[in-house]
Amino acid sequence: MSVKSVIKSQYRASLAMLRQAIEKCPESMWLDTSYRNPFWRVAYHTIIYTHFYLHPKEADFVPWKKHIDEFQGFNPLPEGQQPFTKAEVLEYLELCLDQVDDKVDALDLEGESGFYWLPFNKLELQFYNIRHVMQHTGELCERLGAHGEIEVGWVGMAK
C-alpha cells in the first residue's frame, strides 16, 4: 500500500467519523449556544480547513459555492446571518470527500506545505490536517456523549 493510499484512507475514515457526529447531532444541539461555539460551527470549521489544506497553496483554494468568510473561524456571526443547516454542512463534507483522491494524488509529499505559516512539508501537512479533523470530531463526540450517550463508531480506515 502506498503512502498516498494510506493518507486517502485516513482522510476518508476521519471524515466518516465527522459525518456520523453530524448526522447523529440532535436538532436541539445543532444551534445550542451553551458552548462557546455551536455544534454546526465546529463542524463547518473542521470541513473548511480540511478542504483548504487539501489545496496546493492558499491562492489555489476554491471555496465551496455557499462559503461565507465569517463562518470559517469562531468569530461572532454577522448580524442577521443564518447558520448553515445540517444538510448544508453534510453537502460540504461530501464535496470535500469527493476531492480527497484527486487532491492527494496530485501532492508532492516532499514539497513545502504551500502555506507560509506552516513550516513543514506536504506529507506532514496531511498529518496536521487529519489531526485537526480528529480533534474537532472528538470534541463533537464528547458533546454528543454528554448530551445523551450518543455514540459515534470508530472508523479505522476507509476505502
Task: Indicate where each model-derived feature is located.
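Short, contiguous alpha-helical
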Residues: 8-12, 19, 27-74, 115-159
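Amphipathic alpha-helical packing segments from all-alpha helical-bundle domains
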Residues: 16-20, 96
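Acidic/histidine-rich alpha-helical segments that form the ligand environment
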Residues: 74-114, 124-134
